[in-house]
Amino acid sequence: MAGHVVVENLGVSFTGKDKTIWAVKDVSLEVKSREFVSLVGVSGCGKSTVINSIAGFVPPTVGDVTVDNQPITEPNSRRGVVFQSFVLFPWKTVRENIAFGPHSRGVDEKVITQSVDQYLKLMGLMNFADHYPQQLSGGMRQRVALARVLINDPDVLLMDEPFGALDAQTRIFMQEVVLNLWESTHKSVLFVTHDIDEAVFLSDRVYVMTAAPGSIKSVYDIELERPRGAEIRLDPKFLDYKRELYEEIREESQKVLGPLPLF
Amino acid sequence: MRQFALRSSGIIILLILWELVSRTNLIDPGLFPPPSQVISALVSLTLSGQLPKDVFASVLRAVAGFILGSMAGLFVGAVSGRIRAFDAVLTPVVQVLRPIPVIALVPLAIVWFGLGETSKIFLVFWGVFFPVWVSSYLGISRVDKNYIWAARSIGVRREKLWLQVILPAALPTIITGLRTSISLAFIVLVAAEMAGSYLGVGYRISAYHLVFQIDKMMGYIVLMGALGFIADRTFAYLVNRTLPWYQLSVNQD
Amino acid sequence: MIIRNFKLLLGILTLVLFVTGCGKVSEEESRVTLGQGMGVLNAPIFVTNEKNFWESQSLQVDVRPFVAGRLALDSLIAGDIDIATIGDTPVVYGLFKHPNLRIIATVMESNRDEKVIARRDAGIDSPGDLKGKRIGVFFGTAGEYYAIRFIEAQGLSREDVSFINIKAPDMVAALSNGSIDAYVSWEPHVQNGLRALGENAVVFLNSDIYTETWNLVTTAEFFNNNPEAVRRVLRAVVRGVEYTNANRKEAIDITEKQLGLSRDVLENIWDDYDFKVVLSENLVATLRNQGEWIQASSDLSKGKSLPDYRQVIIDQPLREILPVAVSIP
């Protein structure tokens, strides 16, 4: 059972011009193997920093980050990352983007071609294999980005506001795509978002972060039955979770933005 | 085809106007020879074999200087754009040398390297180096770190990042610098050839100027323009041919 | 009534303006922009500038130096300057395209100014060794004409050597670093080459092939619009030439300052220059000779006959100021 992420008392600071700025402070969370966990919080609370630490992009200043009891020292294809801005390589075609990972790890070319075809089919991108990312819509680009990560068969999937740049319809469609994928592959997922509806719909557990410097404010276990379909969004339990989480986030927003102005 | 006709109509109108103005004797045709005379000068210079030799000499100098200058600019720009220690040492040096107009170095190049090919190639090299350095430095130092993270997290090893991620990501910026340098290479070359030579397009412009052979001088000036145009088009063609994604990225951003 | 008075008033006003205006012209300063080619042959103009002989002629002269008279000619043609000092060769070239060029006086004659300087280690010990060598020449100047005549006097033709077009001040460097084997130029450039190369240099001089004239050149338009200014310039230059000849030491000092040549060097070559204000038959002859040479060697005058070089020379102002100086009919 691989893909057990443990974050303990994580703090990350950056040295600015004349002072040290803490992006996150005292974050502890856990993603058990095959669990879908979301991290929600207001903009700028340091959600992405948590992802970046687990990915191995940013070393922890204090605290520990481990996956399957191994401390993280650098990025690794066992931990796949999906970015909000897709970050596809514009100089590579869709096929080349997806093949890039196995290719640089020296996987046999025949094997690569086969599994790229499989992911192209899975993502409905067969007709766009030789297109460049710039020629695709946002939703298609994010599917390429997902395929590029999944082809490496990672234990952990780190998703940093992956649908933040998509329109509402595409977003809902992509949520269902991700849910289906997760249900068939059962990766551990840490999903960062500021969209409460999205977090409740997808997750087994939701962590709420405080405003910057972020730490964990509260944890909610989402006890909704799986598999989940679109209709679950109207379930009273679903709406209760949403309401509670909404209140939590609202408190934090007010810390950042101040109380509502009186007109 | 219609596009082409439309595009060339402007040039044709310009030529007709030029011919008419020269013919009406409003301006002394000796000083402002009509295109027909310039073209016939070009034809006879071509038939005599002189013009092809000049073009060959100039193009060779431009190409040699361009290749050397852009390779050096790319290398120094890449190294100083990515490696702190090199940045600290090299960038101030480049910044101090960069504002010197390359034309001002023509006399120095003659003193250092004489009037032969070395001084001409050196000047073109100098002229090309800086814009390519600037564009490579900026392109490479500003590569979106997400590209590097994305690559690392799908298993691309650190030592492979240079060729597989950083360079291609910076390429659009570098290409802009290269394209600017092409026209610059020709400007510098003309200045270098005018300072002293016995072959080349710039040399002929200067030599015909001094002995009042204005039709031939204009012929070589037009030729210089044509060479610059062809070089730019060839570059654009090669870029689009070898990097089909480049045009897409440029239109996107 | 009012109208008639008004007309009268206007008439008087015009008359007053005219009279005072006319009166003013002869008193008023003339402004002239003078372009000077740099060389020992320009010494009397350096002296005229330095002693400001312009001032006593009510002239305000803005002097602009040029590397060669040939380049001053471009400015004259473009109308940036009014009068220039130029050798004869550029004027002959220019006349094919600009028939409005006019010579108002010769201020110097010399058959020892232009010389050939070569590197001994390029295998050149005598003029005949120039065959097959790279020779720096500033095209369009008297140096080019001299170079051709020099080569021809050796029984060689233009094709037997390779001429490289270089601006005169760049020649020393080009010869020093070996990118040319020899060059042809006027002073100070040959003396500068000698100083740079020392024992390795060899200088050839053939004084029988060409007598160069250094001239005050203007355009027909400038003369027609400013005849008085031209006369004043001539008077000032006549004084400058007299002063140059009468005060050799001081004239050399002034020239030394302008060209950066040492006193000793200038002393040695000073007598090679005959500073005098003249308009002689020699000028017409040298213009015609060069015109024929250009006609034969290039297609510049294609289908055209040579200009009447006598008409290029305006002798009337000099004839008024210094009658003995004019020896052409």
Where are these predicted regions, by residue range?
Chain C
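Pocket-lining segment of extracytoplasmic ligand-binding domains
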Residues: 89-90, 163-164, 169-257
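Ligand-binding clefts/hinges and TM-proximal coupling segments of bilobed small-molecule sensing domains
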Residues: 140-159, 236-268, 306-310, 320-325
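Bacterial signal peptide processing site
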Residues: 23-25
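Secondary-structure end/capping motifs
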Residues: 224-301
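Short, glycine-/small- and polar/acidic-enriched structural segments
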Residues: 27-157, 162-165, 181-187, 201-210
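C-terminal motif of bacterial Sec signal peptides marking the signal peptidase cleavage site
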Residues: 18-21
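Conserved C-terminal helix/tail region of periplasmic/extracytoplasmic solute-binding proteins
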Residues: 295-329
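Bacterial N-terminal signal peptides that target proteins for export
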Residues: 1-9
